[in-house]
């Protein structure tokens, strides 16, 4: 893969930034694509652009505002509360988001001569999003290959690891401090360690605390 090109689906968050560093390590050339779907915090797009610029990565922003029109949700509507009732999908779930994002990333990848697509989806997060499942990604990979007659490979470096292991991966890639200080995970739009209260911040902090304890224990 060292001689090939990849496109990373990139939001500027912890997971996708870790995947961006992973891709830089794996491929000869890397581009990033970010989707504007009228998300609650436009800062997400600015954050992604700043990270891509700092890393010298070509960055494309695609307008996906249609998604908000079709599937209103707590990630795009400030009048909707972020909730997660037991047995139900969180209010932050956006129907069709990863289906559309990966499909458009594939179209872009083919146009720029890349066959590798990297995304930070994983099954181990609390959310249970159906479009983060390995079976979905593998199914879509086959569909994209058939639809464009092109040998795409969708990579999911985080699929089977939890947040603590994601922090460990960023550390192994030499990007731990970068990811901690410059990424945006917080639903309230606070870069770095975030607000500490929203579900995304709580998940991120729990993983960070676990990893730091493990790292400290390993060094003793």
UniProtKB/Swiss-Prot annotation:
Sequence similarity: Belongs to the QueC family.
EC number: 6.3.4.20
CDD domains to which the protein is assigned, alphabetical: QueC-like
GO MF, one example: ATP binding
Keyword hit for Ribonucleoprotein: no
Record's catalysed reaction(s): 7-carboxy-7-deazaguanine + NH4(+) + ATP = 7-cyano-7-deazaguanine + ADP + phosphate + H2O + H(+)
Pathway: Purine metabolism; 7-cyano-7-deazaguanine biosynthesis
Source domain of life: Bacteria
Role this protein plays: Catalyzes the ATP-dependent conversion of 7-carboxy-7-deazaguanine (CDG) to 7-cyano-7-deazaguanine (preQ(0)).
HAMAP family in the cross-refs: QueC
Coiled-coil spans in chain: none
NCBIfam families: 7-cyano-7-deazaguanine synthase QueC (TIGR00364)
Residues that hold Zn(2+) according to the record: 186, 195, 198, 201
Gene Ontology biological process terms, A to Z: queuosine biosynthetic process
Quaternary data: Homodimer.
Cofactor mode of binding and number, as noted: Binds 1 zinc ion per subunit.
Residues reported to bind ATP: 10-20
Name this polypeptide is given: 7-cyano-7-deazaguanine synthase
Naturally occurring in which organism (per UniProt): Bacillus thuringiensis (strain Al Hakam)
Cofactor(s) of this protein: Zn(2+)
UniProt KW keywords: ATP-binding, Ligase, Metal-binding, Nucleotide-binding, Queuosine biosynthesis, Zinc
Pfam families given in the database record: QueC
InterPro entries: QueC, Rossmann-like_a/b/a_fold
Xref: SUPFAM superfamilies: Adenine nucleotide alpha hydrolases-like
Keyword Cytoplasm among record annotations: no
